[in-house]
Every structure is written in structure tokens, then in C-alpha cells.
Amino acid sequence: MPNSAGVEVARISVKVSPNTKEFRRELKTDLEKIERELSADVPVNADLNAAQAKADFKRLMMQLKTEAARGVNIPVDVNVDKDTKGGFLSRLLGGKKGLSSLGDDAAKASSQVQHLGKSFLDLTRTAWIGVGIVAIAAPLVGLVAGLLAGLPSLLSAFGAGAGVVALGMDGIKAAAETMMPALEAAKTAVSSTFQTGLTPVFQQLGGLLTTLTPNLQNVATGIVNIAKGFTDVVSQGPGLQQLQNILDRTGEFFTGLGPVISTGTQAFLTLSNAGANAFGHLLAPLQEFANGFNDMVNRVTSNGVFDGAMQGLSQTLGSILNLFNRLMESGLQAMGQLGGPLSTLVNGIGDLFIALMPALTSVSSLLGNVLGTLGTQLAPIITALTPAFTTLADTLGTMLTGALQALGPVLTVVAETLGTALTTALQAIQPMLPTLVDSFKQLSETLVTSLGPYLPQIGEAFGQIVGAVIQLAPTIISSLIPAFQTLIPAIAQLAPSLVQIVQAFTKLMPVIVPVVQIVINLAAAVVQAGASIASFLIGGISRLVGVLADCVGAVAEWVGSWSSGVQQVSDFVGQLPGKIKSWFDDAGSWLIEAGKNVVQGLINGIGSMISSAVSKAKELASSVKNAVTGFLGIHSPSRVFAEIGQFTAEGFGNGFEEGFQPVIEKAKALAAELSQAMESGVDPSGILAGISTKELKQYSAALEQERKRIQVEKNAIPKEDKAGRAALQAQLDQIKAQKDILAYQRDRIKNEEDYVGAAGDDPLVKAASGLMNAPVDFAKATGKQFLTDLGISGDGAISKAITEGIQYIFQIGSVDEALSIKDREESKNALSVVGRA
């Protein structure tokens, strides 16, 4: 069918299209080359104020336009590099690192700064909590560690003070004897007061003790029984042995603690000594705290703050105590009602927790192992990243501190302005508030007065509606329950049928499983046959390509006619550098006209060549037809090729093993040589000399075909034959390793071709070769159409014969007979397709 890209003439299509893939490759190569050769560092000072940054950028662009309007005198060297497209100015102004991207870079920098601020301020609550935890983690750990480190020295200091007091107790007693007369007088006076006041009290207690004596005797009897029970256990039998064992083990424990106490004491003394040396560092903050505390106490006691605080504390304490009394009373009342439900809740929660204990234990074990391993693996990573984190923190701290210092005055001015505006607005609104409150009060009173008489009536009406709806519930329930009761017997009648269906399906499973296995085996055989047929089809196409060699030779003459035109183009391009200077002054006027002429010339050229291309295509098609009929000695290619297609599948099985086996052997030998070279450290380039990536790909395809054949043989071996399956699996592993070696070498060669030779290719030669690809594309399209006419592609005779696949038609009387016939057919087909192993 004709379209915008071609014109159909009979059965031959002529298509003229640009080689965009080659253009993209050239463009990518040029851009990469420019990046390697030309680079510039553009300092960008990002202003946090977006408006200021835009204004600076506009001012810079105006200066650039002014300088550009004055004009410049650019010296052009005639001996330019032909491989570089565009001059220095074009690369400077239009390249990726040129001045033309300065505005984009500045805009991007401003956008990134704004995005950083938004991202920093838009953190979620959880993120801020995480940031806070991270921020206080290190100081908190350091504070705790410092306190723990200073604790031994503080304990030593207090212990030393207590020891000194104990040692000087005799002196303290001797000094206290001077106050003994006064102390004795005070004791006598106080004792007299107690004696006078407590004598009646103790007389009453004497009578009480007389009354309580029998009860106290009962308590003493209980205590005696407790002591007897304890003594009976520890003085005889297992109890005595256990007590002896406890004492022995305790003695051993104390004996073993000797080195521990020695080492611990030494460490404690060392730490205490270091702390004592650092006591001087603590005096200054303690003195400062004491002075500040004294000043604070003087202030709050003199200005009435302390008295007000005590009054507020008394009020708060009174409220708390009253609330405690009320809560206790209400709690006791609630406990009397909630005893049973709370007991049920506690028992249920306990049962649930006990049932969940195995699962919770497993989860805890999982989390412990995973998190522990994660921490162990992350520790060296964090250690390696610590210098980077430290540098980043210092850099961010410096940057943020500078930014905040710069923003502080600005924000202060903004806050003062907003404060003044808000104060003025609130002062203006303040006189209006009493009027608004009075208006709302009058409105509410009016609403209550107007709607008050009707609210009880509305409530009564709603109550009647709810009562009527509730009365419908018994009717609905009495109607639905019999209906459900009627459905239950019908549903129950379905249960036996469902049980029979399940039982029947269970009985069918032993029969269905072998059938499914048969289907899987058939699918594997079809896939194997399809892969083999595809390999044969490639060989047939290669033979047909030989028939088309004459056609390609004719096209080669046409390609040769282009060489003189390409040489002229190359000579003309060589003269271009000398003309650049004269053209550059008036570039703006002639570029548009030149572009129009180029496009119009391309259109005219394509139009003038259409008729010639059609004539040439007819001539080539006639040559192809005559070459085929002359080569085969026939006059009806369709009939002969139809017969060839009928016998292709029959001859394929005979020639497959002989034609395909050498390719496999060559691929294996090449992979073995490459493996030896890689193991010995020898450069494999000498082994791959003369071998292209296409040939390596063909070798990989041959090895893949061999792997599939061995896989089919392995699947045919019973699982009980472990030795045979292991031997075939070893062959499969070896073929996989050989394929990996060939794939690696193919990728290496391809990368060398792409990245080593790309920089040295002449773009003009590539453009000329792209133009010369047109006749080759024409030949490919003609050959593909010719194959379609022969019935080899699409819905042709040979393709139909190939895609028919393999069918099994059985005339059987039992499933066992079908399985036996299927096994015999598969064995025959495997021998005819892949040969004997």
C-alpha cells in the first residue's frame, strides 16, 4: 500500500528515508567530543532573594546584549580541524558550557536554593522528631558518660570526708563535752515535760496491754511455728544439703571475686584520681551557680515573687487534694460496678498475650538478629563515612549560620513592620468589639425567645417519629426470619451435591495429573522442534542470499557512481574554512535563504530520482527473476519452490546434524581457548583476530541450541537415574560457562568499536556513507519482497508448513495405551531431530 515514505510499483517498493540512527550517533559523538575539548568554570553566587537574583540576571543579559551589539573582530585560522563541527564562538555561545547556558545555570541555582529552603521547612512532624533525636543523641550520651566518669571521684570525695569524720570522732566528742552542762539541763527539762504529759497515757496503755495479752500470745505462737517450719527445713534432709551447697558455692564465688575486686579497685582508684585532678574545673561553674542562685533567692524574696508562688502553690495543692478525694470516691463507686467486666478483660488480655507469646518470641528473635546484624554491618560503613559527615556538618553549620546572620536583620525589619501593622489594626478593631458582642447577644436572645416555645414541640414530634420507626422492627424481623428459615432447607439440600462434586474431583486428580504431564511434554517437544526449524530456516535464507549476489553486484555499480560526487563534496568542504570569515559578517541574512534552498533542493532531488529509481527497481527485479530461473533451469519458480517447500522439512532432519555440529564444536573450542587465556592473564585479542561480533553471536546461538538439546535429553531420563541426570547437568553447566565467555568477549569488542573508533571518524564520510546506504536498503527491501513472493516469509507455503507444528493423533482404547504411543512417537522424533547422544 502506498504511504508517505514510499511508492508502490507492482510488487516492488522504493523507500527513501533519512538515516536518523546514524545522525543521532554522530550528534552524540560530537557532543561528547566538545565536552572533552572545551570546558569552562562559571562561578555562580546564588542570592537567597529570588527577585534580586532575577534582577541581577536581567542586568547581566542587558550588558551582554550591549557588548554583542558593538561587534567583535574574530580571527579565523584556515587550517581548522575538520572533525570539529562549529567554531569557537559557536561552542562558546551555544555549547553545553558556553555563555548561553549562564542564565539557565543561574536560574537553576536560584531554584535549587528555594527548593532547599522549602524542603527544609516542609519536614513532617516525624522527620522533625527524628532530627531532634539525632541532634540530642550525641550530647546526651556525652553527658551521661561524663557523669559516670566523674561519679567515682565524687564518691571518693564524699567517702574521704566521711572517713575523716569517723577518724576524728573522739576529738568531736571531746569538743562536745563543753556543751554537756547545757545539754543535761535541756534533757532534764524536756524529760520532765514528757514525764508529766505521758504518765496518764502509759497508764491507759497498761490496761490495754492486759487486755491484749492473749492475742499477743497467739501471735507469738504463730511466729514460733514459722521459726519451727524454717528450722525443720534447714536443719535436716535436702534442706541442710542445699544450705551447705549454697554456702560452699558462695565461698567459691567470694574467692573468685578476689581478682575482680582487685582489678575493679585499681580502675576505680585510677578514675577517682583523674577526677580529683579535675575538681578545679568544677569549682568555677559551682561558684557561678551559687552566686546566681543567691541573687535569684534575694530577688524573689524581696519583690514578692516567692510569696505569690507560695500562694499559687497552696491554691494548686488544695485543688489537687480535693480532686484526689473526688476521684477516689468516684473510683471506688466505679470499681464496685466494674469488678466483673475488668476481671473478664484482664483474663482475656492475659489469654491473648499467652497465646501470642510464641509469635512475639519469634518476632523478637527475628528483630534482634536482623537489627543486630544490621548494626554490625553498618558500623564500619558509618566509621568510613564519619569524616564526610563531619565535613558536611561543618560546611552546613557555616553556611546556615551565615545565612541566618544575613537573614536576621531582614527578618527583624519585617517583624517590626508586621508588628506595627498588626498593632494598628487591632487598635482600630478594639473599639468595635463591645458593639459586636452586644449585637450577637441581642441576636441570640431574639432567637431563643422566638424559637423557645416551638423547641419542645419539635422534640416531641421527633420522639413520635422514632417510636413509630421502632414499632416497625418486630414486623420486619417477623417477616424476614421465616423467609430465611424457608431458604435453609433448600441450601441444606445443595450440601450433598457439593460433597459429591468435591469427591468426584478428588477421584479425577490421579487421572488429570498424567494428562497435564503429557501436555507439558508435548509443549517441550514442540518448542524443541520450533527451535530446530528456525535454525534450518536461517541456513535456507543464507543459500538464497547467494542467489541474490548478482543483484547486489548490480547495485554496487550504482554505489560506485556516487564516489565522484562524494569527492567533490569533500573538496568543497575543505574550502569552507577560508570562506567562513567573509560569510560571518552577513550570517543573519543568508542563513534563512540557504536553509530554504537546501530543503527545496532536497525535495527537487528526491522528485527527480523517483522515476530513475522505479526504472532501476524494475530492472533489478527482472535481473533477480532471470537469475533464479537461469540458475535453477526452470520457467515456473512458484511451482518449483512450492515443491521445494514440501520436501524441506523432510531433508532438514538428515542435514541438521552434519551441518550444525561443526559450528558447535568450533564454538566450544573458541570458548576453551578464551577461558585458558583469561586464566593465564594473556590478552585474548590474538585469539579473536578476524572474528567479528556477528560470528560470536552465531556461536552463542549454536551453544544455546546444543544446551536445549541436552536439556531435552535430561528431561527424558527418569529421576531415579541420578548419575545420568548429573552427567547431563555437568554438560549444561559447561555450555553455560562457554556462552558467558563468548558473550563477555562480544560485549568487549562492541564497546571497543563504539568508544575507541568513534572519535576519529570523519563526520563527512559518515554522511556520505549514509547516502550510499540508500541502494543497499533498496536491495534489502527487494530481497525481502522476493522471499515473500516465494512463500518463505509471511503466510507462504514453506512458513505454513513450518508453523503447522507437531500433532499427535491417537486411536486408543485406554489412557495407558495413549501414554505408550506418545512415548514411542517422542523417541522417534527426538532421534530424527537431534540425533543420538
From Swiss-Prot:
Cross-referenced Gene3D superfamilies: Leucine-rich Repeat Variant
SUPFAM superfamilies in the cross-refs: ARM repeat
InterPro entries membership: ARM-like (IPR011989), ARM-type_fold (IPR016024)
Descriptive protein name: Minor tail protein Gp26
Source species of the chain: Mycobacterium phage D29
Gene: 26
